[in-house]
């Protein structure tokens, strides 16, 4: 048995935490807050969601006042949320290797890893091999692009990639 850990250390969820820390963190660190790094970064993920929901609610009110149905207003508000757009832009910059974004990512992920290590040590957990998504995602992205070209997947307006599995009874 080879004990492995697969760390999902990149993606929009990571950028949400990074953006919230950048906007609302005032330079807070695990040391200044007295919190484990993984808990601190998790707090910023929650902070992003709180601000995002408030933004969507405000935009929905604007759109329903313009005569849109609640469903239409919600979809438009979620699609046009400046906060979510910033998070997506940050992800694009991360993928392009932007030094500022990558520096913030490395700093915050190191906080998370230190918090994880503390927990693993307390629990007596160890791993033979650790895999980081940030080191493997390009291969997966290549496969997704091939799937799009071959028609196995489709892309939604928001840029997300989906597979239609209704024929398999999964929708």
Question: What function would you assign to each model-found segment?
Answer:
Residues 1-171:
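NTP-dependent nucleotidyl-transfer catalytic core
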């Amino acid at each position: 048995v080879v004990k492995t850990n697969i760390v999902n250390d990149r993606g929009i969820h990571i950028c949400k935490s990074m953006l919230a820390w950048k906007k609302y963190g005032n330079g807070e660190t695990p040391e200044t807050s007295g919190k484990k790094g993984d808990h601190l970064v998790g707090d910023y993920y929650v902070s992003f969601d709180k601000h995002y929901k408030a933004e969507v609610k405000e935009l929905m009110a604007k759109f329903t006042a313009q005569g849109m149905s609640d469903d239409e207003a919600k979809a438009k508000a979620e699609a046009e949320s400046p906060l979510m757009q910033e998070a997506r832009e940050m992800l694009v910059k991360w993928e392009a290797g932007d030094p500022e974004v990558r520096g913030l990512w490395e700093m915050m992920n190191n906080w998370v890893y230190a918090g994880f290590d503390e927990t693993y040590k307390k629990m007596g957990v160890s791993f033979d091999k650790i895999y980081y998504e940030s080191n493997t995602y390009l291969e997966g992205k290549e496969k997704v692009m091939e799937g799009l070209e071959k028609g196995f997947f489709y892309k939604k307006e928001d840029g997300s990639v989906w597979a239609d599995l209704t024929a398999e009874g999964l929708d």
